[in-house]
Amino acid sequence: MAVTRIGLAGLAVMGQNLALNIAEKGFPISVYNRTTSKVDETVQRAKVEGNLPVYGFHDPASFVNSIQKPRVVIMLVKAGAPVDQTIATLAAHLEQGDCIIDGGNEWYENTERREKAMEERGLLYLGMGVSGGEEGARNGPSLMPGGSFEAYKYIEDILLKVAAQVPDSGPCVTYIGKGGSGNFVKMVHNGIEYGDMQLISEAYDVLKSVGKLTNSELQQVFSEWNKGELLSFLIEITADIFSIKDDQGSGHLVDKVLDKTGMKGTGKWTVQQAAELSVAAPTIEASLDSRFLSGLKDERVEAAKVFQGDFSSNLPVDKAQLIEDVRQALYASKICSYAQGMNIIKAKSMEKGWSLNLGELARIWKGGCIIRAIFLDRIKKAYDRNSDLANLLVDPEFAQEIMDRQAAWRRVVCLAINNGVSTPGMSASLAYFDSYRRDRLPANLVQAQRDYFGAHTYERVDMPGSFHTEWFKIARAAKM
């Protein structure tokens, strides 16, 4: 006999927390995990956290049969083969019209393949991005479901209550679009997250290495920044990090953390997609490259011995001015990073015919997710003003903000260069802006070179058509 409204398979911390969130919102939920101890652990947590209606099952048949028809099962398992294995386990007991939702960070084409395979079996399928980490899953994530619209309608009432709630814009969930669009949008969200984190780390590096700010001063600076236009989850937690003392030694914990950044692959996927779509995303690419370089810890230690010396300019620094300049540089760079992410999504939407609403994406990212920020409200309004906006940089408000901040931005990048401090994200953002704002680039020389050695032809600025010049013959004749 059916006892629950929905099921969830995969009870690592994210799965457990999402199940408890669903139950807490008034929806009885069945839970299943291949390792049965996780089932018992989740049920016990439900009791401790308020006798929540969570029902555990140790075998897939009982689990599926406990859910009311048409059945909806969310999977939260590792991307790739584990997803296919879980689908096979569940599908053996599901009936026509039932629905499977993959809530993991899956490659969008895998979602489209699975949706097609499930459709052939009479099952519905959704790929749903879930952002917010463990805390978000428990208390309200940002949700990005894409795939079968019929499947979305099955679960819309649950998602609207489970998602993060933002007072001025509602639940942080919307139907993203067809196919693998939900997973694709979550992937790019993560790429933007890479950019955000890199830019913040560069702001920290300049303030510490050039401005000589202490951790206590950095905590105060980031706390103050979190009251203005940079107000965001990542700025907030950065301020928190600078306040934490090392409980296993002296000083602050942040200074004891190894400078080697991990990653799970979504940032790399984003950069690969940008390349496939011919979309410039240098800030996001720089953030990925920085993670690769951070992984070369042993090589960097040896290189530091080879390139010994003081690269600082030894010029006096006005600390207050530096803090303000870095704040402005961070904000301007952030605009460029988000512009690149949105352009990747727009290009993919056009290629796949998804008709994605970029303003709506900004809205559902305002709460619950890792990149949640007051800044996203500005992005939503920009796309509300012009849904066909070519680039966030040319929105009138953002354009004015960048113009107002570019002097500080340039000062920070130059100061970093002169002091041997790398700012790949800020530098890439500035180069992106400078390239995008110019009506003529030195690409004419590159195209001339291509025509010289490869007869790739070129276009002219003064007449239509495609042209080829015998550059070598002309140059050789001129030298004779």
From Swiss-Prot:
Keyword Oxidoreductase listed: yes
Classification lineage: Eukaryota, Viridiplantae, Streptophyta, Embryophyta, Tracheophyta
Principal subcellular localisation of the protein: cytoplasm
Subunit text: Homodimer.
Pathway the protein takes part in: Carbohydrate degradation; pentose phosphate pathway; D-ribulose 5-phosphate from D-glucose 6-phosphate (oxidative stage): step 3/3
Top EC group: oxidoreductase
Protein name, UniProt field: 6-phosphogluconate dehydrogenase, decarboxylating 1
Binding site for NADP(+): 10-15, 33-35, 77-79, 105
Keywords on record: Cytoplasm, Gluconate utilization, NADP, Oxidoreductase, Pentose shunt
Induction notes from the record: By drought, cold, high salinity and abscisic acid (ABA) treatments.
